[in-house]
Amino acid sequence: MPIRVPDELPAVNFLREENVFVMTTSRASGQEIRPLKVLILNLMPKKIETENQFLRLLSNSPLQVDIQLLRIDSRESRNTPAEHLNNFYCNFEDIQEQNFDGLIVTGAPLGLVEFNDVAYWPQIKQVLEWSKDHVTSTLFVCWAVQAALNILYGIPKQTRTDKLSGVYEHHILHPHALLTRGFDDSFLAPHSRYADFPAALIRDYTDLEILAETEEGDAYLFASKDKRIAFVTGHPEYDAQTLAQEYFRDVEAGLDPEVPYNYFPHNDPQNKPRASWRSHGNLLFTNWLNYYVYQITPYDLRHMNPTLD
């Protein structure tokens, strides 16, 4: 799926170097196709890096995807140039009257922060409430999963004593579910979080269907039966080096972090890690776009009536 982005977005050249099909707005305007409109609420500090990661996964199908980047934190960023934010991001007020086929809410490094202490917690709640009537399907990632479970289902914040960091094995629970179609019975995916997602807790509080779990019984992938919301508690979008960058950052900060599990060859941080989750990440996002967005979204977005057959 060629992603449609502004011509000047840094991700264009970055992804083209990887032979990822990126269609600029100027080229896409010549095609008589109604693109899928996907809004990305990017909560990560290094926004350009996160853009590259998600756009890579959204690019692998024959339809156009029109990407809109959203920010809700008005504070000055220490990790992303203000010019980039001003040029490529919109504020909620700019899009609140629009409808979208899909919404992705990224993770954020807020695992040890109480919800009410998050600077933009009211804005998160506002976006989630708005999405019920303006978005066909929403995908929450990592910390955003914890936030959404609290806002939508009242699940209290669950925090691990130690950070979960590494590449973990998971197994699917429903092999014929659309979101896991084509998955191997067992697959690897990276995690980097303090948030805890016991599968039993999610079953107790919600009617969400858990589609994949970790070997330890944590929920990894789950969704509503109507396909309107989906949750992934790990980071299938991560680059091969992302966990390493986080590890060495914490080492330099004197935090004495654990070496990420099952990540560095021979468990030696001096060895170059390899991504063992790329096929899983690509398939997950392709399935979400196809079965949870494209198959049920209305052709005319002015009328939000997803087909939930």
UniProtKB/Swiss-Prot annotation:
It is found in: Cytoplasm. Signal peptide: none annotated. GO terms for molecular function: homoserine O-acetyltransferase activity; homoserine O-succinyltransferase activity. It catalyses: L-homoserine + succinyl-CoA = O-succinyl-L-homoserine + CoA. Coiled coil: none annotated. GO terms for cellular component: cytoplasm. The record marks G111 as: Important for acyl-CoA specificity. The record marks S192 as: Important for substrate specificity. Keywords: Acyltransferase, Amino-acid biosynthesis, Cytoplasm, Methionine biosynthesis, Transferase. CDD domains: GATase1_HTS. One of its GO terms (biological process) is L-methionine biosynthetic process from homoserine via O-succinyl-L-homoserine and cystathionine. Its EC number is 2.3.1.46. Substrate binds at K163, S192, R249. The active site is at C142 (acyl-thioester intermediate), H235 (proton acceptor), E237. HAMAP family: MetA_acyltransf. Belongs to the MetA family. Transfers a succinyl group from succinyl-CoA to L-homoserine, forming succinyl-L-homoserine. Homodimer. This is Homoserine O-succinyltransferase. It comes from Escherichia coli O157:H7. The gene is metAS.
